[in-house]
Swiss-Prot record:
Belongs to the phospholipase A2 family. Group II subfamily. K49 sub-subfamily. Gene3D superfamilies: Phospholipase A2 domain (1.20.90.10). Pfam families: Phospholip_A2_1. GO terms for molecular function: calcium ion binding; calcium-dependent phospholipase A2 activity; phospholipid binding; toxin activity. It is found in: Secreted. GO terms for biological process: arachidonate secretion; lipid catabolic process; negative regulation of T cell proliferation; phospholipid metabolic process. Monomer. One of its GO terms (cellular component) is extracellular region. Disulfide bonds join C26-C115, C28-C44, C43-C95, C49-C121, C50-C88, C57-C81, C75-C86. This is Basic phospholipase A2 homolog AppP2. Expressed by the venom gland. Residues 105-117 are annotated as: Important for membrane-damaging activities in eukaryotes and bacteria. The lineage of its organism: Eukaryota, Metazoa, Chordata, Craniata, Vertebrata.
């Protein structure tokens, strides 16, 4: 769910998911998809594509279990769809950490209507 995702992002990046990524670029946060503005925005684009593959669970509301051991996210979920959702969230949190140097404040509250048609997943 959104709660686990937010926790993972905070653990990996040290940033608050809502205030730092909630409306970043064309792909972070709710709604729109568009051509990514930078590597950080591409992380969110790939994450949305990952979520599109989930068929038996709801990424907004369904909860899963994971642990944080030795600064690593471990998806412990038995349910296959929830485990896949956990892996999607883990991947975006790591991607955002790996691309912290591309984070650009000018995309923090980006006007989504300026986004061009998205790439396909």
């Amino acid at each position: 769910s959104v709660l686990e995702l937010g926790k993972m992002i905070l653990q990996e990046t040290g940033k608050n998911a809502i205030t730092s990524y909630g409306s970043y670029g064309c792909n972070c946060g709710w709604g729109h998809r568009g051509q990514p503005k930078d590597a950080t925005d591409r992380c969110c684009f790939v994450h949305k594509c990952c979520y599109k593959k989930l068929t038996d669970c709801n990424h907004k509301t369904d909860r899963y279990s994971y642990s944080w051991k030795n600064k690593a996210i471990i998806c412990e979920e038995k349910n296959p769809c929830l485990k896949e959702m956990c892996e999607c969230d883990k991947a975006v949190a790591i991607c955002l950490r790996e691309n912290l140097d591309t984070y650009n404040k000018k995309y923090k509250a980006y006007f989504k209507l300026k986004c061009k048609k998205p790439d396909t997943c």
